[in-house]
Amino acid sequence: MWKHVKQVDPEIYEVLVNELKRQEYGLELIASENFASLAVIETMGSMLTNKYAEGYPQKRYYGGCEWVDRAEELAIERAKRLFGAKFANVQPHSGSQANMAVYLALAQPGDTIMGMSLSHGGHLTHGAPVNFSGKIFKVVPYGVNLETETIDYDEVRRLALEHKPKIIVAGGSAYARIIDFKRFREIADEVGAYLMVDMAHFAGLVAAGIHPNPLEYAHVVTSTTHKTLRGPRGGLILTNDPDIAKAVDKTIFPGIQGGPLMHVIAAKAVCFKEAMTEEFKEYQKQVVKNAKKMAEEFQKRGYRIVSGGTDTHLFLVDLTPKDITGKAAEKALESCGITVNKNTIPNEKRSPFVASGIRIGTPAVTTRGMKEEEMEEIAEMIDLVLSNVTDENGTVKPEVREEVSKRVRELCERFPLYRDKIEGVEI
């Protein structure tokens, strides 16, 4: 593997090998990360990257598209079958571009959109002021009830009635509960808005049938194809409305993108095929079991979990009672081979660059084959680290760092990731 890279560019080869080692021997708990199969990785690294294919299958602006047409057609048909959609666009380069395409297809610059506040669990592209969505459109953010820390649907309705948005966005990047899509659609219909659901985080759960399918209520659904779907980095747009599908297609190309990434689209097709298996369904069930178990273990150790738990693949830990910042916790854990990300919590008092919480997700460790027993062990190790942080920079007592680093390595060796499947690389 990578023998040609080693010959041509030793510096990048070093990057590849060291990143492989980091993934192989570290505990990945960032909720938006996962480990793609070698089938997906091989497809992304194929000669399909050489092919320009502006347009759509059978309607290209270039010749020689016979086989990339086939790849995209497979991706489209599999996406439609997987999620029960009548129309699918597999060309978005990312979830952000999928969201941008929907906004520009259904609204005009200056129109009002509603999305969950970033500080309450939303995403940058749902209207954050620093993002294109917050610059192009008038944004009315909604949030969670500060008592229950779940979406305040009455407040969503009140804001919608007051501001009459063109689009209401449901979904988030740090929201652990199942969203009431039916309630959102009722609110959207009441004010004549489109309902767009961004299911980037929980698409894998939807594909496995263990999470409500937003297509039952949404006018249009966007997603990424990595995260819980465990595919290549990319975007996806689904709808059952032919007019919306036509508008979205025109907005993706020629609106905001040129040539599609055919090597990634083919890898999406592989990902969708993998997601149709019974093995994938069992995997997703275990992802949720693991998240629930780990959240419970944190609660046993005196940590406060935002909203009291989780229904999905992730949860937020409020570190305020432990007198440690999210930034310090992230640094401390990383020094021991455990990766999480600092995250704001509802009613946050600190800067998002410091934050009062950490976000934890179980998709990646579950891909390795870990189950509830390992979640208990991981929670115990995290608690040990966070109980021995000596300063605001996340410095951990040396003896604790050494102990936990050793335990992390041993745990990862019990659940190999890629090292028993690839040849020619010593890790």
From Swiss-Prot:
What GO MF terms are annotated? glycine hydroxymethyltransferase activity; pyridoxal phosphate binding
Grouped into one coarse class, the protein's main location is: cytoplasm
Q: Which PROSITE patterns match?
A: SHMT
**Where found, per UniProt?**
Cytoplasm
Which CDD domains does the record associate with it?
Answer: SHMT (cd00378)
Biological processes annotated in GO: glycine biosynthetic process from serine; tetrahydrofolate interconversion
Signal sequence span is none
* Alphabetized UniProt keyword annotations: Amino-acid biosynthesis, Cytoplasm, One-carbon metabolism, Pyridoxal phosphate, Transferase
Entry-linked InterPro entries? PyrdxlP-dep_Trfase (IPR015424), PyrdxlP-dep_Trfase_major (IPR015421), PyrdxlP-dep_Trfase_small (IPR015422), Ser_HO-MeTrfase (IPR001085), Ser_HO-MeTrfase-like (IPR049943), Ser_HO-MeTrfase_PLP_BS (IPR019798), SHMT-like_dom (IPR039429)
Top-level taxon of the source organism: Bacteria
Protein residues bound to (6S)-5,6,7,8-tetrahydrofolate: L118, G122, H123, L124, S351, P352, F353
Reactions that this protein is recorded to catalyse: (6R)-5,10-methylene-5,6,7,8-tetrahydrofolate + glycine + H2O = (6S)-5,6,7,8-tetrahydrofolate + L-serine
What EC number(s) does the entry state?
2.1.2.1
Q: Which SUPFAM superfamilies match?
A: PLP-dependent transferases
Modification type N6-(pyridoxal phosphate)lysine: residues: K227
Q: Which cofactor does it need?
A: pyridoxal 5'-phosphate
| Residue numbers marked as site, Plays an important role in substrate specificity | H226
Alphabetical GO CC annotations of the entry are: cytosol
Which PANTHER family would you find in this protein's record?
SERINE HYDROXYMETHYLTRANSFERASE, SERINE HYDROXYMETHYLTRANSFERASE 1
Quaternary context:
Homodimer.
Similarity-based family = Belongs to the SHMT family.
> What does this gene product do?
Catalyzes the reversible interconversion of serine and glycine with tetrahydrofolate (THF) serving as the one-carbon carrier. This reaction serves as the major source of one-carbon groups required for the biosynthesis of purines, thymidylate, methionine, and other important biomolecules. Also exhibits THF-independent aldolase activity toward beta-hydroxyamino acids, producing glycine and aldehydes, via a retro-aldol mechanism.
The name on file for this protein is Serine hydroxymethyltransferase
Query: From which source organism is this entry?
Result: Thermotoga petrophila (strain ATCC BAA-488 / DSM 13995 / JCM 10881 / RKU-1)
State the encoding gene.
glyA
